[in-house]
A protein has these predicted regions:
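Short, polar/charged alpha-helical segment
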Residues: 42-66, 191-198
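Solvent-exposed, acidic/polar segments of extracytosolic/periplasmic ligand-binding ectodomains
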Residues: 30, 345, 349-412
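Extracellular/periplasmic Venus flytrap/periplasmic-binding protein
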Residues: 83-86, 137-138, 146-254, 287-297
Length: 412
């Protein structure tokens, strides 16, 4: 073989190797352990989320920038940190390197600790945690981890948006705070009091209650205390049965006050709200049911397939970010994907989003919506009630963004 021919062959071989590396991840199956409740009082929430993950995975498997296939592997954690750790052990035993969880910051905190230890002790078998709904601010502050990425806005960000809205509602004078007795509920109360004192010092906090998570079946005693306090407004971070049963008890007692919530759109709560709650129930989130466009089409298709609402939309952002990061890293290795996720910016269903490098907290726009009858502008019937959540305020990412004290070590 002549020297020029040799060079040509070597060049082609090098190009082939480069192309192979560029698409090394293409066709790979990426298993994601979904660790959340499928039994107990919070089962309806978990069942909706699992369906949503499987639906979005199927959508991305048809087309994503990394050319990978996502497979969601469910584990029932019964909203228990201990059960979450058992599920994580089972997942790692099956060589599953991606974990997603959201229902309960207690479980999220336990997973972060265990994943940190696993990744330190088992180089080459690192696990990456995508948190889609556990919103304790400590997870991206004092307890931040290189291996943890949060898709939802945290408690402090949501409260920043809620209190920015409340500030201009001059009829609000007396507030009662009720929450679940774990990290999230405690943080909601803390930030509500601090933000109200800063923005509306004239508002009185006339009562505060914490109750066990997913254990209370009758909220009548709590509602009686709210009524007796003279509150005109309730702030709550409750979710699942703890919100739907609270609202049910409030309706039965004729408690005619405003509720500012984080999760009034979650399974079961809209049905519990009913017509009597119209104009009084607000929720803050990274979207709402009447956004239309791409996410509107997904909602309609999901409802046609399952007769259920697709409301945990950051699941879409999660797989969008993961597939973009895998394409960027040219790998499905969690070590390389974590590095590619840091600082990643893209356009999602709710506008421009950015995975902030300093603490792995997603930066995104937030909306406040109110419960009302469907109309031409807001046509999506939530849980087939004839009612919907209509947007009343929209805040750009920078408005609700909060600073971080995170001091994580970046990279391995």
């Amino acid at each position: 073989m002549t020297f020029p021919k040799k060079l040509a062959v070597l060049a082609l071989a090098g190009l082939a190797l480069q192309c192979g590396a560029a698409f090394a991840q293409k066709g790979e199956t990426v298993k994601i352990a979904w660790i959340d409740p499928l039994s107990g009082l919070m089962a309806p929430i978990g069942q909706n989320q699992l369906k949503s993950f499987q639906y979005i995975a199927e959508l991305f498997n048809k087309n994503n920038p990394a050319g990978v296939k996502f497979e969601i592997v469910p584990f029932d954690n019964k909203v228990s940190p201990a059960e979450s750790l058992t599920a994580l052990k089972s997942a790692t035993d099956q060589n599953i390197r991606y974990v997603t969880q959201g229902d309960g910051s207690g479980s999220a905190g336990a997973l972060v600790d265990a994943i940190n230890k696993n990744n330190e002790r088992n180089p080459g078998k690192e696990v990456l945690f995508m948190n889609y709904a556990a919103v304790d601010p400590d997870l991206t502050n004092s307890k931040c981890s290189y291996w943890h990425f949060r898709l939802d806005a945290d408690t402090s960000m949501k409260m920043e948006a809620l209190t920015t809205f409340i500030k201009d509602q001059k009829d609000i004078k007396k507030v009662y705070i009720i929450g679940q007795n774990y990290a999230h509920g405690v943080q909601v109360a803390k930030y509500a009091k601090a933000d109200l004192a800063r923005k509306r010092p004239d508002i009185q906090v006339v009562g505060e209650d914490l109750h066990p998570l997913a254990k209370v079946t009758d909220f009548a005693p709590y509602v009686a205390k709210i009524k007796a306090s003279g509150a005109d407004t309730v702030i709550t971070g409750n979710w699942g049965s703890d919100l739907s049963l609270l609202v049910k008890a409030a309706n039965e007692a004729g408690l005619d006050v405003k509720f500012f919530t984080y999760y009034a759109n979650n399974s079961g709560t809209p049905t519990a709200l009913g017509p009597g709650a119209a104009g009084r129930i607000y929720f803050v989130g990274y979207g709402h049911p009447n956004m239309g466009g791409q996410i509107g089409k997904l909602q309609a298709d999901f409802k046609a397939k399952f007769n259920d609402d697709f409301y945990v939309a950051d699941i879409y952002a999660e797989l969008q970010l993961l597939s973009e990061a895998m394409a960027k890293a040219k790998s499905t290795d969690p070590v390389k994907v974590a590095a590619a996720l840091e600082g990643l910016r893209l356009k999602s269903y709710n506008g421009d989003i950015e995975m902030r490098k300093t603490d792995h907290q997603l930066q995104q726009d937030l909306w406040i919506s109110v419960w009302q009858k469907t109309d031409a502008k807001n046509p999506y019937s939530v849980e087939n009630t004839g009612y919907t959540f209509a947007p009343v305020a929209h805040y750009d990412a920078y408005v609700a963004s909060t600073p971080t004290s995170c001091q994580m070590k970046h990279g391995v």
